[in-house]
Design a protein with these regions (language model features):
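Short, acidic, small-residue-rich periplasmic hinge/interaction motif at the N-terminus
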Residues: 37-56, 68, 81-83, 114-120, ...
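Short, acidic Ser/Thr/Gly-rich low-complexity loop/linker segments typical of extracellular
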Residues: 86-101
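Short acidic/polar hinge/loop motifs at secondary-structure boundaries
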Residues: 103-105, 182, 208-234
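N-terminal periplasmic accessory domains that precede
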Residues: 129-136, 144, 176-179, 214, ...
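Surface-exposed extracellular loop regions of Gram-negative outer-membrane beta-barrel proteins
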Residues: 248-263, 303, 307, 319, ...
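Face-selective signature of the C-terminal outer-membrane beta-barrel domain
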Residues: 332-358, 380-524, 545-552, 606-609, ...
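Outer membrane beta-barrel strand-and-loop segments of large Gram-negative receptors
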Residues: 444-448, 492-494, 583, 589, ...
Length: 807
């Protein structure tokens, strides 16, 4: 009997152990195939397993390739069939992966490939070791076939909700910025997103941290392959990372010059906003050289009305009506390169700089009625001016990513530098009352190393992250408080280890992160020992998940640590008005949060439930400035709450009804904090209900309509009260030219003029109610043109991301 060996080739990187339940029938079939001496391919679920009989004298080979359209866009799920050119006998077959790639066993040198996909002309080609196949559109076939975009269904697996974007209704939403707002359990828009139960997420694009969310306004939603929402990030993420949204771009394989032009204009009742951007990418072989230039001009118009009570030596009431105009302009430049040495190794560098276009101005005016013991004491006319001066900021990232066998090494190094300079002047009844000048200089150096390797039946990740920050803050004022010269040096050194294991329908994860944080706080270059702490923290993470058929469930735990922002730590006193000052607290300690989260989905329904217990939570609060010398002045400052908790649940449903594809999210949350140590009375712990609905309509002739809205209910929670708020938006877009190269979108925001912000809270011996409206009702038009579309292959993920956010 001859000695034989069975070769298994799969189009995924998953190990066979993960699908152990299906290996036995595959082996049984392979025996019968061996008897016939014919290699074959078995489709096992979504994985194509090629089984090939190999004798000692047979040379085992395989062919690899990618299937693209005429614009170099990958075509996923195209059918690939290999057959004998002489007898037309079937040899093997598969479908392409999401990036258009495929792999098949190859032993017959005379074999041919037949490649087919709906809407494209079928091609028959001779087999080669490496193939790049371009399918041409079949115009006649497209005229008789209607291709429908379906509503993507989120699937929870391995700790993340994964939603396919490419080819779904989400790809029609214009920009990645618009698309993110419609992901499950995401609320907010324009960079101000929150994950229900977790808070503000970090955004990653192809593994690279997105520092400026305006970048997502320049990225088309059609260029996104899929989005993953990680509600409880693992140990390799910084201790302050609340949640993560990972975006993966469609990999486009075109060569030569490509680019896109983007323009946006919107007009409110008072405020215009405009931005223009141009992006270019030149690709030759494995080298990408890219660059971008962008400019933006914004004018905001805000009206607010506040009522404040302060109870000290007397009862003081302040009734303030104020209007603020803010004019800003900004320019952005970036350039860089990425070089793929091979499919296994790449490196690159990116430089980015931005600056204000001239001075940016803010002008505020209004009046305040001051009552003392219900008697009018003063009617004050207030006018203030502030100015920010232009300074270039500089950011550099360099990275290396390489695979060595089954090991992966990813290294990032970052440098960041910026200067902020501003001035303020305030007039009361036309007389100059206060002036101040502020200058801040920031420097950051950071590195991060992540090594990933297989271990037993799972995957192990370990690495280090280092961050070194230097910040100087100079504050000079005209006499209402004291000058300040603060200098902060901080270093954070971290190491982490994480392991993920899949066994049958179960998956397990565990990780541990260690952080050593040292802070040196100087006032006038004199070290302040009490304000220069050293912290050593262990940050654990654990998760467990179950997947079977349409049901996916996971439970996770993580400890988060949040260091106060540098603004929170400032000791200088800012002049807000004649009767209100503001300052930070350099004695703030890091906030620690224990998070427990249950996630899951069944078919098109997803759900989350969460509980968070927080130690030393940061809180903005109001108290008397100085009862003895200034009993009528209110101070806005920072405090920590020793113990607090918030918890709740949410459900998301995304069915599909023909051209109408709705998406509904309903949530409830509770918040409790004991504020007795601050002498702040609480109002209650009522449930806060929120509802959000997106209605998407995919119409003929490349038209698309979106109508979305949200509303939250009244609720008294802890020391504050939430008032019922809501918003409605409308979008309509149409694609033009071949391959939808031109997209025009009309946007109507805050249709019902309900986008108000309300604030109602108790303070120490004080209470404040605020109503604010920022000219949100507006009409806008977005135009995007793309040519020879390719995406940069830059894979730098950045280091020191948490410190960049603090700066």
């Amino acid at each position: 009997m001859r000695r034989s060996q069975f070769i298994f080739i799969t189009n995924t990187k998953e190990t066979m152990d993960k699908r152990a339940s299906s290996i036995i029938p595959c082996l049984a079939l392979s025996i019968s195939l061996f008897a016939q001496s014919n290699p074959s391919t078995i489709v096992d679920g979504k994985t194509n397993i090629a089984i090939q009989d190999s004798t000692e004298t047979t040379k085992i080979e395989q062919i690899k390739g990618v299937v693209m359209d005429e614009q170099q866009n990958p075509i996923p799920f195209a059918n690939i069939v290999m057959s004998s050119s002489a007898t037309n006998t079937y040899i093997a077959g598969c479908v392409t992966a999401e990036d258009g790639s495929f792999v098949l066993p190859y032993s017959d040198k005379d074999a041919i490939l037949k490649v087919s996909y709906v809407g494209y002309t079928t091609q028959t080609l001779a087999c080669k070791p490496n193939m790049s196949i371009v399918l041409k559109s079949d115009v006649q076939l497209l005229n008789t076939v209607t291709i429908k975009s379906t509503r993507p269904k989120a699937k929870f697996k391995d700790g993340a909700f994964t939603t396919l974007v490419s080819g779904t209704i989400l790809a029609e939403l214009g920009t990645a910025n618009d698309m993110i707002s419609q992901l499950p359990f995401v609320s907010g828009d324009d960079g101000n997103w929150e994950i229900i139960g977790r808070g503000k997420p970090e955004i990653y694009l192809n593994g690279r941290k997105v520092e400026d969310t305006n970048e997502l306004k320049r990225l088309s939603a059609k260029d996104i392959l899929k989005a993953e929402i990680v509600t409880v990030p693992g140990a390799q993420y910084g201790s302050s990372t609340k949640a993560v949204i990972r975006l993966y771009a469609v990999r486009k394989r075109g060569q030569g010059l490509s680019g896109s032009l983007y323009s946006n204009y919107s007009q409110g009742h008072y405020s215009p906003q405009t931005s223009e951007h141009a992006q270019l990418n030149y690709r030759t072989g494995g080298l990408d050289i890219f660059g971008e230039v962008g400019m933006a001009y914004n004018r905001s118009h805000t009206k607010y009305h506040s009522e404040t009570q302060l109870n000290t030596t007397n009862n003081f009431d302040y009734n303030t009506r104020r209007t603020t105009n803010y004019n800003s302009g900004k320019i952005l430049l970036n350039t860089g390169f990425n070089y793929e040495i091979s499919e296994q190794q790449s490196f690159g560098m990116k430089y980015e700089t931005n600056n204000l276009i001239g001075n940016n101005y803010s002008h505020s005016w209004g009046e305040t009625d001051v009552l003392q013991d219900d008697i009018l004491k003063e009617n004050l006319s207030v006018e203030s001016f502030s100015k920010s001066k232009p300074h270039w900021s500089h950011s550099v990232n360099a990275y290396y990513n390489g695979n060595f066998g089954k090991w992966n090494i990813n290294f990032n190094a970052d440098y960041y530098n910026n200067v902020e300079q501003s001035s303020q002047s305030v007039l009361n009844d036309g007389i100059l009352d206060a002036e101040s000048n502020t200058k801040v200089k920031n420097n950051l150096y950071a590195t991060k190393l992540v090594v990933t390797a297989p271990l037993w039946k799972g995957k192990m990740s370990f690495g280090t992250e280092e961050m070194f920050t230097n910040r100087r803050n100079t504050f000079i004022q005209s006499g209402f408080s004291a000058d300040a010269f603060n200098h902060i040096k901080q270093s954070i050194v971290a190491g982490f280890l994480e392991y993920n294991l899949n066994i049958g329908s179960m998956n397990y994860g565990a990780g541990l992160r260690y952080e050593h944080q040292t802070t040196k706080y100087y006032e006038k270059e004199v070290l302040q020992t009490e304000q220069s702490p050293t912290y050593n923290d262990w940050i654990p993470f654990a998760s467990i998940g179950y997947s079977h058929n349409n049901l996916n469930v996971g439970f996770s735990y993580r400890l988060n640590k949040y260091s106060p922002s540098y603004t929170m730590l400032q000791s200088s006193t800012d002049y807000i008005s004649k009767y209100e000052y503001g300052c930070g607290d350099p004695h703030l300690k890091p906030q620690k949060q224990h998070s427990f989260m249950l996630n899951g989905n069944y078919k098109w329904v997803s759900f989350v439930a969460y509980y968070n217990y927080v130690r030393d939570m940061y809180m903005t609060w109001y108290k008397p400035y100085d009862v003895a010398t200034h009993p009528d002045i209110l101070l806005q400052t920072m405090a920590t709450v020793p113990r607090s908790s918030y918890y709740g649940a949410a459900i998301n449903a995304a069915p599909s009804f023909g051209i109408w594809q709705p998406d509904l999210t309903a949530s409830v949350n509770f918040y409790h904090a004991n504020l007795d140590h601050l002498n702040i009375p609480t109002m209650g712990n009522e449930p806060l209900f929120s509802f959000e609905m997106n209605n998407n309509f995919k119409l003929p002739h490349r038209w698309f309509i979106n109508l979305s809205g949200n509303v939250s209910t009244n609720a008294k929670q802890s020391a504050g009260r939430n008032k019922c708020m809501g918003n409605v938006q409308f979008r309509v877009s149409k694609n033009f030219l071949k391959n939808d190269a031109l997209k025009v979108m009309l946007v109507l925001r805050d249709l019902l003029h309900t986008g108000y912000y309300y604030f109602d809270a108790n303070g120490t011996q004080s209470h404040r109610k605020l109503t604010q409206y920022s000219d949100n009702q507006e009409i806008g038009i977005n135009v995007r043109y793309t040519f020879n579309a390719t995406n940069s292959k830059y894979k730098g993920s950045g280091a020191g991301n948490s410190e960049k956010q603090r700066l």
